[in-house]
């Protein structure tokens, strides 16, 4: 019997959920993969459409909902959100056998899972690395994820070259 591969996917916003949705459906077609979905960021906020309901409507079982995110964009709120999620994700990573963690894009909400992946030596699969968003912290966050990632799936050859040059 082949060893099951445990893949945890982390989604933070509607913007990347179409990719998460597609990947979950594809992975679940193959019995070798065990997938678990961790939902955080804006998915649970009413003022962002409470998109957690869309995730459930797609038939996905949510393994963990991270509820510490608030819509405040000030640095103190963001750091507190990340701090709280570091602890929650640490509890998961301490107990679970995880082979890979899938992270999409560049949102600061992902930093808590990146830190835990590094500390618990979990391999990060990053989708959307190498892209450029000038004038905001997205580039810095994306580059942190890219540097921490074990596997990269850039959206174009240009972005692939940017990752290689890092």
Regions found by a protein language model. Give the residues of each.
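N-terminal subdomain of nucleotide-sugar transferases
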Residues: 1-42
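Structural motif
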Residues: 10, 38, 103-105, 127
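Helix N-cap/beta->alpha junction signal
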Residues: 13, 106-107, 155-157
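Conserved nucleotide-sugar phosphate-binding/catalytic loop shared by glycosyltransferases and other
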Residues: 34-81, 88
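Short N-terminal targeting/anchoring amphipathic segment
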Residues: 90-107
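An aromatic- and histidine-rich active-site surface loop
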Residues: 102-119
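Active-site-proximal region of nucleotide-activated glycan assembly enzymes
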Residues: 122-166
């Amino acid at each position: 019997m082949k060893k099951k591969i445990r893949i945890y996917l982390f989604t933070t916003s509607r913007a990347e959920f179409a990719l998460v949705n597609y990947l979950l459906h594809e992975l679940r077609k193959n019995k070798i993969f065990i997938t678990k979905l961790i939902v955080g960021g804006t998915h649970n906020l009413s003022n962002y459409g409470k998109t957690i309901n869309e995730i459930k409507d797609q038939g996905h079982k949510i393994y963990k909902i991270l509820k510490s995110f608030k819509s405040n964009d000030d640095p103190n709120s963001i750091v507190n959100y990340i701090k709280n999620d570091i602890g929650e994700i640490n509890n998961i990573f301490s107990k679970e056998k995880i082979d890979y963690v899938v992270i999409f894009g560049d949102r600061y909400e992902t930093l808590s899972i990146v830190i835990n992946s590094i500390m618990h030596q979990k391999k990060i699969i990053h989708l959307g690395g190498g892209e450029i968003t000038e004038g905001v912290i997205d580039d810095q966050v994306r580059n942190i994820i890219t540097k921490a990632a074990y596997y990269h799936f850039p959206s174009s050859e240009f972005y692939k070259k940017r990752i290689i040059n890092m």
